[in-house]
Amino acid sequence: AIDLGTANTLIYVKGVGVVVDEPTLLAVNKSDKSIITIGGEAKKLIGRVPDTIELVRPLRDGVISEIEMAEELVKTLLSRAIGRAYSRPRIVICVPNGVTSVEQRSIETAAHATGASEVFTIEEPMAAAIGSGLNIFEPYGNMIVDIGGGTTEIAVISMGDIVNANSVRVGGEDMTEILIEWLRREHQILVDTGIAENIKHAVGSAYQYDKEPQVTVTGRDIVRGVPKQVLLEASDVRNALEPIVNDIIEAIRISLPQTPPALVSDIDKDGAWLTGGGSLLKQMD
């Protein structure tokens, strides 16, 4: 099974577990579009490449923006995962809700090119529901809030189908970007995405919690160009993340009036199921 996400791509092999967990990123030669490296090796090049090399994210805001690059990424990662150990496997690929038929065929073609005997696609909210252990075939409303790297998808599932779906183009990567901008604006330092992600994981939160920590961050002083350290409070980081969190909450609120009353009653009893990397933000539940 393949989870093709905006930020990361995971491959799971039945009976083995997750065998690939790589950033959805490629380093490409600008002149001939040849691929230099992908995944984690490509991520190491962020901020360190010459003008002749381009870092490409084939998915943007939850949709496939670079079809050929997405196809190459899937093909390469599948070849690594499958190797010679599996002969003509059956593959299930998670795709964003609302993916176009052209995008879907392209990903299926890439999977077939690795020697797959059969290729199936499943929408990400449905896969998240199954992975959460929910009985999706019951006449019962389950709300999935899948906070990915570039998109948050909200879906209400009942009787094996998506009854109502809504999405907002914000996710974990937007949290990282807003922290970079906030540090530049409020503290006059520049940091890369790796440092911003560390801040998010260390002290980021959706709401206040007990014994909130501090974190010291080193970046480049915008004015003098020298290293500069800043001590950050968890409350300040939370305030910086607030616009993204509010966008996600608003998307959930919009989904409820579009849902049949009986299913809303079910959701009121059980709440929503949070999935995706963005759901790991402290106090997100």
Give a label for each model feature:
Residues 1-147, 155-272, 279-285:
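Nucleotide/phosphate-binding catalytic cleft detector across ATP-hydrolyzing
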